Structure formats: structure tokens, C-alpha cells
Amino acid sequence: MGSSPKNTEAGELEKAEAVKLFAHPGIDFPTILLAVAMWAGLVANFAWAAGVSEWTAWICLRHILVGTFFLNMSFTIWHEAAHGTVFRARAANDVLGALTAWPAMIPYFTVRRDHNLHHDFVNDPERDPDFWFLEGSIWSLPFRYPKGAKRAVEIVDRSGRPAWEVNLDRFLLVLVLVALGLGIWLASPLAVLFAWILPKGFAMWIHAWYVNVLPHRDLPAERFHDTRIYTQAWLVPLTICHSYHGLHHIWPTLPWHRYPRAFRLKRDFLESRGVPIFPRSKTS
């Protein structure tokens, strides 16, 4: 028997929605707005901290929390830029990526290549540069960081990256050191510590949890089976939609703010491929 007109029409509408949803946005304004919000928040927090004359426990905590909140946005922005989803031009994506990885003290061109290798070899103990995140407790991450970061850079170096990427990252690192020095001189060491350095550490730890450990731990290095999707609504604002990370590994150029809609549209396909989805109920 043929499909009914209603079913045919519904199928066509779904196909049209999918084409629009998975198309490049041209200019991804939600990500640009996130970048503006991040920079505005970080600058305001540091200016606020610069005016502090007496550092009580509450004031220290206040600036750590505000700084961590805004630095949590950094990953999403440079990650989108690394995948080329913010602009069509690669150079424009790289400028935005470098500008938004910089306050998190992340060498953008190194991490861009690292991330592409991660996608190529997800959960491979030898070739995934991010596998070290999964090799111990999330609580021990700060102690494992130097060794893990060194291993990741070694894998990136073996990929044959050009000298200009290395030199640009070194230049950006020098700018970080200059900014730290200026911050200490113009404000105070405590302002730099509580409004920038500690928030950077906490934001990196949070990213490791929801981008590496939560989606990838104890999963095989197999397409469709290597990354989880969590559909709980409360995780969406906390992770900036990266609770749908399994969706990203299948369609890496899908913008972050489209993940929930894309999941609803593609859930049957994802389940048919055995993608780990939590919770299992379709009411989620």
C-alpha cells in the first residue's frame, strides 16, 4: 500500500526542516552574541575586582563564580570556530576562535588541531589526544593535567602542523603573560588570581567533565557508540547544549544551539544506530 497524503506531507515537511536545520548558518549570531557576552562579563568582573580594597571570603568567591560563569562560554565559542560553523570563511572563524580561547589561556591553533584529531580517533587510547581525560578520576584531573597536556601536544606535533600555527600560539601566550603582568600592576595580584586564574582553572575542570568524561568514559572507539547523549532539560543551560555531545560527533558542523531540535528530529535514526541515549524514555 502507498503512503497516505498526510504521511507524505509530514515526511516532506520533516525533510525540509532537516535541510534548514543542518545548513550552514552563514553567520551564526547566537555564537557571536555568546562571545560578546563572555568578553563583556570577563572585563566587567575584572574591573569590579580591581576596585576591591579588602578581600573577604565572600568577595573572593563572588569573583571566582562570576569569572567561571563567563569563562565557561569560551569552549563553546572556540569549538564552533574550530568546526567552521560561525562564519563561512576559515580566517574569520580562526580570528573568533583565537580571541575567545585567549582569556581561557588556551592555544587556539593547537587545540583546534587537537580537537580534529579527537574527532578522527574518538576513544582510541593511542591516537585520541583527549583520551587522558578518561584515564583517571575527574577529581584527580588537576594533578594529571601537566602529563596529559604534554601527551596531547606530542600527538598534535606528530600530525605535522605548520610552523605558523606554533608561532601564532606562542605569540598569543606571550600576550597572556603580558596581560597577567599588566593586571597585577594596574589592579592587584589578588584581582588577577580571583577574577582570572582561578576561574580559568574551574572552567577547564567543568569542561573536562561535560565534554570529555560525561559523554565518552567507558565507551568503545566505534562510530555511533563512542559518545553519549543526555536529554535532561536541566543539563542544557549548564552545559550550553553539550549534553547532546553524541549528536555533535555525528554531525560536527551542526551549531550548538540547534542540538535539541536536531535530536528530536533525528532520534529514531540515532536509536537505530545504537547511539547511547539517556534517559531511554521518549518522553524526555
Predicted features along the sequence, with ranges:
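Non-catalytic, topology-defining segments of multipass membrane proteins
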Residues: 1-73, 77-78, 101-198, 253-284
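Juxtamembrane helix-capping/reentrant segments at transmembrane boundaries
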Residues: 24, 86-106, 126-136, 222-235
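Alpha-helical hydrophobic/aromatic positions enriched in membrane-embedded helices and signal peptides
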Residues: 30, 64, 71-72, 208, ...
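Histidine-centered catalytic micro-motifs
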Residues: 74-84, 111-123, 211-220, 238-256
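Juxtamembrane/interfacial segments around transmembrane helices
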Residues: 87-94, 115-120, 144-154, 219-230, ...
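Generic recognition of well-ordered alpha-helical segments
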Residues: 98, 209, 237, 261-265
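Alpha-helical transmembrane anchor segments
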Residues: 199-238
